[in-house]
A protein has these predicted regions:
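Acidic/polar, glycine-enriched structural segments that form the non-catalytic walls/loops
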Residues: 1-80, 160-165, 171-178, 234-243, ...
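Structural helix-adjacent loops and short alpha-helical linkers that scaffold large soluble proteins
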Residues: 36-46, 94-107, 153-171, 234-252, ...
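Alpha-helical scaffold segments in soluble metabolic enzymes
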Residues: 176, 231-234, 303, 413
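Active-site neighborhood of glycoside hydrolase catalytic domains
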Residues: 219-261
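Non-catalytic C-terminal accessory modules of carbohydrate-active enzymes
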Residues: 307-314, 335, 351-492
């Protein structure tokens, strides 16, 4: 193989790293030490939460007999391969068990198998540690979300030592992605498999929706790369280790491209751009990566977010469908990415809404999705790969026991959007958006490197009533409590 050397790869400490050998804990050993949600009157939510952790711990494994993986990891639970984007979302909830098992070290195995030009394959066999794709295949890598995952972890625990280690491979991968996944104008491309959304009908009909780039500008990939610039810049603000002027320039360029080229003013939506310079006019969930990238100008935000409120589009029985319901190929039972509600993309929408201050609708969507997932859990006893958008049932093309990334719903969405508790280590506080009126909270909540908190809100007669909050912490902490347009600061 021919490679162009990438100077950041030379700083990648995971390549050739001595394997970490730890005893893998069992759920039975650790269940009493996990965070314990309180949600009076909703025992089924707690049962679903417990099931998610039990299944997740059952998917932790040591490296198989090979010299390539360097850390214990949580399996993707799909096809015997470790997936880049599945892992990034699995760790969004795995972080809450940090002090019991480091789910985050799953990504170590991807960093350890980085090629010397910066490439990382999106899918690597768990037993042999082999790439499933050649690097110039449009489906070989992506989505590029690992920097978001690492920053999310840092925001919860402030682990600067890990940030120092992961910066180089993340930066190297961004450089590779920019050199190998852009058109001549600096816009980005992928494929159905490369973007992780296999069969969304977004390409011109002569191209294969799974494997072809279709000579198209991909809205999700452009927004993800803009977002990735931002997270790498934030990391460098902490680490002060790099010249990131190229990232600043690229972020500004992608922001301009997204808003001048991929926006349709009439429909107030961001679209993919076909090779004939026509917007494809397919409203799909990939567009909403623009929220997390902070690409949506304030004057466009209300009209854009309105699509998530429209029952003819994305506001269905379940949230959030991957294809707008007014598309002729929308399937009310799912058909994989032609309508199904998926845990990772719905979580992305919630995070993007929250990043833009749209907290009320983030709560509404999160509450709806969690309610449906718990309802289906009650009916089937398991968590599914995806869910039907128009019915409280599994998607018609979905796998059971998918924990896997579906664990993000009864854990992270439950904690962060329904219970409303979000960690902000960089601000040295927790923000608690109190939307519920029943007694609720979390016991044994991990925050930062040393904090363990018990957080309890007593029952209220209405959403306007001031929450009565009890906080117990082993270290001093600030809790910003927000409710009904008001807020108060608690120091414990």
């Amino acid at each position: 193989m021919t490679y162009e050397d990438n100077p950041y790869v030379e700083k990648n400490e995971f390549i050739g790293m001595k394997p970490i050998e730890d005893r893998i804990p069992t759920y039975e050993e650790m269940c009493d030490k996990l965070p314990k949600p309180i949600f009076d009157g909703h025992d089924d939510y707690i049962a679903c939460y417990d099931y998610a952790w039990r299944t997740a711990f059952g998917n932790i494994t040591s490296p198989f007999v090979n010299d390539k993986f360097v850390s214990d990891f949580v399996k993707t639970a799909f096809n015997g391969c470790l997936f880049m984007w599945d892992s990034s979302f699995i760790l969004m909830y795995g972080k809450y068990a940090k002090r019991l098992f480091s789910f985050q070290q799953t990504l170590n195995n991807l960093y350890a198998l980085q090629h010397k030009d910066g490439y990382i394959c999106r899918e690597i066999t768990e037993e042999e540690g082999l790439d499933r794709f050649c690097r110039h295949d449009p489906s070989s890598t992506g989505p590029n979300l690992m920097a978001w995952c690492e920053w999310n972890y840092f925001e919860s625990f402030g682990d600067i030592e890990r940030l120092k280690k992961v910066y180089a491979p993340l930066r190297a991968f961004h450089v590779w992605f920019r050199k190998n996944r852009t058109w001549r104008d600096g816009s980005y491309f992928s494929s159905g498999w490369g973007c992780g959304m296999d069969n969304i009908p977004r390409l011109q009909p002569e191209y294969d929706e799974r494997f072809s780039h279709g000579y198209m500008v991909w809205i999700d990939t452009c927004a993800q790369q803009m977002m990735n610039c931002d997270f790498l810049i934030k990391m460098n603000e902490v680490l002060q280790c790099d010249d990131v002027s190229d990232l600043v320039e690229e972020r500004e360029y992608l922001n301009k491209l997204i808003n001048e080229t991929l926006w349709d003013e009439k429909t107030a939506f961001y679209y993919d751009l076909w090779r004939n310079n026509e917007l494809n006019m397919v409203k799909h969930i990939g567009s909403f990566w623009t929220l997390l990238a902070k690409a949506v100008p304030e004057e466009r935000l209300e009209r854009y977010v309105a699509h998530l409120r429209d029952p003819k589009e994305f506001n269905r029985v379940n949230a959030v469908p991957t294809l707008s319901a007014d598309h002729p190929l929308y399937n009310p039972h799912g058909q994989y990415w032609r309508g199904s509600s998926w845990a990772p993309t719905s979580f992305m929408v919630l995070a993007g809404l929250s990043a833009n201050g749209c907290h009320d609708i983030a709560y509404e969507i999160g509450d709806k999705f969690l309610k449906n997932v718990v309802t289906v859990y009650n009916d089937t006893g398991t968590l599914w790969e995806n869910y039907a958008p128009d019915f409280a049932e599994r998607g018609n093309q979905s796998r059971p026991n998918f924990v896997g990334w579906t664990g993000i719903v009864p854990i992270s969405i439950f904690f962060e959007y329904v219970l409303g508790i979000q960690p902000k280590v960089s601000e040295k506080r927790i923000v608690w958006r109190v939307n519920r009126t029943e007694r609720h909270g979390i016991m044994q909540y991990p925050f930062g490197t040393e904090h363990t908190l018990d957080l309890v809100c007593e029952a209220r007669s209405s959403v306007s009533e001031e929450p009565q909050i009890t906080v117990s912490s082993n270290k001093p902490i600030e809790i910003l409590v927000v409710w009904d347009g008001k807020e108060k600061l608690i120091k414990a």
